[in-house]
Amino acid sequence: MWSDNETTQDLLGYQVHADLLRKIILNDAMLPISIGVFGNWGSGKSSLMLLLQQSLHEWEESHQNEHSIILQVYFNSWQFESYDSTKLTMIESILEALDKDINTRKNVFERADDLLARINFLKVGVFILKKAYDNLTPDWMKKWLPKKDDIDKITGKDKYNNLLEDVTKGNTSKFIATFRELFGDLVNDMGYKAVIVYVDDLDRCDPKRIIGCLEAVKLFVNVKKTAFVIGADERIIEYAISQHYPIQMKKEDISSPFSDYLEKLIQLPYKLPRLSDNEQETYITLLLCKNHLNEIHFNQIHQKYLEFRKTDKHSKYNIDDIKANIPENQNIDFYAVEYRLPIVPIIKQFLNGNPRQLKRFLNTLYVRQELADVAGFRDIRPDVLTKIMVLEYNTLYNSRFEELYKLQNENGGVLPLEDVEQEAKTEEGIQNPQWKDNWSSDYLKQWLSSEPSLKDINLQNYFWVARDALKNEKPIASLVTSKVM
């Protein structure tokens, strides 16, 4: 099976996207900048951000000088969703990262103690601001503030005294403005080339938390040397904005006010494209190799694939290419991979090219094949099972999956197809009265006419292993138990 977690092991050819974003961030003239890595659920946004982090780290390692230090901060907004103020929690995370970096590399930073004192002061300010959100009085807040002697040790004393005054008076808007200025001074004095903050899983949060994170980004968006990289489905972000700012669109508006708000905040929208057919075939083939070959062999295959992608961004990298790049003295058994490759054309044709959906589909297929093996169904073909499952995965047509089950159940496991598969290929379309009404859409005709043919195949065992997807059927666990006991 395949893990559903984000990864730096690039099977999608996303390194080119990471390299482009790295080039933008390393251009001093482009900072400060906010980048929106936009894509649908499961499109690989988190993995792209990990690749970008890795790419920037490699650049930093290869440029060991005083102007090459890059601080990268990862903030998962979903994990902090339960916090009272997601915005301030994000700010705290950035300050904690600065603090940790200085303590780790004290020998690199001049006046490290002074920098730490300034960070601690800002951290206290954020803590107090959190309490202000709880409607605590300025008098109560004073006890949390540093003493005057501590303030005097910090450079830029007047600015910090102004911050102190803003907090004690409960002037939160002025506090934010002063905080931004002080934070900018701090980043500059620490000598960073860039401070990069990755905000991930924003689209998993509720609208209130989404707005809180966006407001935190807005706070820093004009601070020199900073870059925010935000991974999200922009449709969900626009929906959150519409819930928070319920503005009525006017007839003369040519764009949504909510998308306008997002455009002001995100200076560079970067949309991940849907995987092409060639990219899907490559991805599925590599996933099969990863699952069915040992780690050493797969790492060799993956490295050759990365080299291939550097010069060819369009072509598929299929099993023939993989075999052609295996050294002659190396004997790798590809049987388990090649046995499953007939599933690729069906998946390319009928799923939507979303990496996470492809992986989850393969995981479900794998579990059902294992179930078939445990149940003693040795004749289950991966391509036939895949063809049935793509209907189950299509929300528009999963009722046809139910219909197929009933049809085969009423006919001893064999669908009464007659000439339906051939009719689906003709201009006249399906004429068989049993199939004509419910199976004449372009998608379903394409499905019926696609390989493999289901004619004369007994599908009882196929639907048995897929019964967890059927309505009003017994739980699959009980079926397995009764079958193997």
Question: What are the roles of these predicted feature ranges?
Answer:
Residues 192-207:
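Conserved P-loop NTPase "ATPase switch" module shared by AAA+ and STAND
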Residues 84-101:
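Conserved NTP-binding/hydrolysis module of P-loop NTPases
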Residues 45-46, 82-86, 236-242, 278-282:
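Switch/connector loops and helix/strand junctions flanking conserved nucleotide-binding motifs
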Residues 34-38, 74, 198:
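Short hydrophobic/aromatic beta-strand immediately N-terminal to the Walker A/P-loop
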Residues 73-82:
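A short hydrophobic beta-strand->loop->alpha-helix junction that borders the nucleotide-binding pocket
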Residues 249-286, 290:
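Conserved P-loop NTPase catalytic core
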Residues 221-253:
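Sensor-1/coupling segment of RecA-like P-loop NTPase cores
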Residues 1-15, 19-31, 35, 43, ...:
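The feature marks long, low-complexity, polar/acidic/proline-rich intrinsically disordered regions embedded
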